[in-house]
C-alpha cells in the first residue's frame, strides 16, 4: 500500500483485500491528506492521519466504485491538497 506513495504526485493510496465476508481497505497518505477522516467517513474505519483502514461489506467491484466516488467527493472538498 505504501509503494504508490513513492510516485511523486501521488498523495493517497489504497489496497483492497478480499476476506470471506468483507473487503478490508488499507489507506496511506502523505502530507496533509487525512486518511483517518476518509476511512471514518466512507468505510466505517479509522486510524492515524497518514495510515488508516476500514471495511466494506459490498462486493469488490462495488467497493472500488464506492472508493472512486468517495475520493472524488473528498477531492471536491479540497481534502486532497
Which residues are covered by each model-predicted region?
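Gly/His-enriched, cation/cofactor- and phosphate-binding structural elements
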Residues: 1-81
Amino acid at each position: 500500500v505504501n509503494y504508490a506513495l513513492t510516485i511523486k504526485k501521488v498523495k493517497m493510496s489504497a489496497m483492497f483485500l478480499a476476506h470471506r465476508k468483507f473487503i478490508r481497505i488499507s489507506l496511506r497518505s502523505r502530507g496533509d491528506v487525512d486518511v483517518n477522516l476518509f476511512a471514518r467517513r466512507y468505510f466505517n474505519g479509522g486510524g492515524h492521519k497518514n495510515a488508516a483502514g476500514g471495511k466494506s461489506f459490498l462486493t469488490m467491484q462495488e467497493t472500488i466504485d464506492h472508493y472512486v466516488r468517495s475520493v472524488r467527493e473528498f477531492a471536491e472538498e479540497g481534502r486532497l491538497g
